[in-house]
Amino acid sequence: MQTIHIGVLSASDRASKGVYEDLSGKAIQEVLSEYLLNPLEFHYEIVADERDLIEKSLIKMCDEYQCDLVVTTGGTGPALRDITPEATKKVCQKMLPGFGELMRMTSLKYVPTAILSRQSAGIRNKSLIINLPGKPKSIRECLEAVFPAIPYCVDLILGNYMQVNEKNIQAFRPKQ
């Protein structure tokens, strides 16, 4: 079974300064560990809400670490310093708006302010980048919604084959 390389990028001014512990990045790692059977190698970084820092981290995770999947958390709201979607768009060759649409629809079941979220997803080379919200509960809800499409998307961009733990979640792959 191939090792899946996963980038986890937390964008947070306060967590990057050690003001509080980054629980969101850990939540992403926990959920993906439940969903995938492959050996996983996580490449984890916390950066301030600075566009150039986010862009550099995304590029490093995609180009240097050759991550199959890069998941960001934080910086997707309407606040002035929330710029993760802009950084993602800048480094991607293609955007995948359906991921953000589904995450907003899912989150609206729980909170009306989900309409303010700007989650997005895109492709850089052979890496799928997905922007998630910043709260662990919301991360789990959004990943549960979009994960069924992730393994097939990674197949299509020629990433490593993701073996799904079907006891915990289902994924969709068209019949060969």
UniProtKB/Swiss-Prot annotation:
Annotated metabolic or biological route of this protein: Cofactor biosynthesis; molybdopterin biosynthesis
Organism: Helicobacter pylori (strain J99 / ATCC 700824) (Campylobacter pylori J99)
SMART domains (alphabetical): MoCF_biosynth
UniProt cross-references to NCBIfam families, sorted A to Z: molyb_syn (TIGR00177), PRK09417.1 (NF006932)
An example Gene Ontology molecular-function term: ATP binding
Pfam families cross-referenced by the UniProt entry: MoCF_biosynth
Top-level taxon of origin: Bacteria
Name this polypeptide is given: Molybdopterin adenylyltransferase
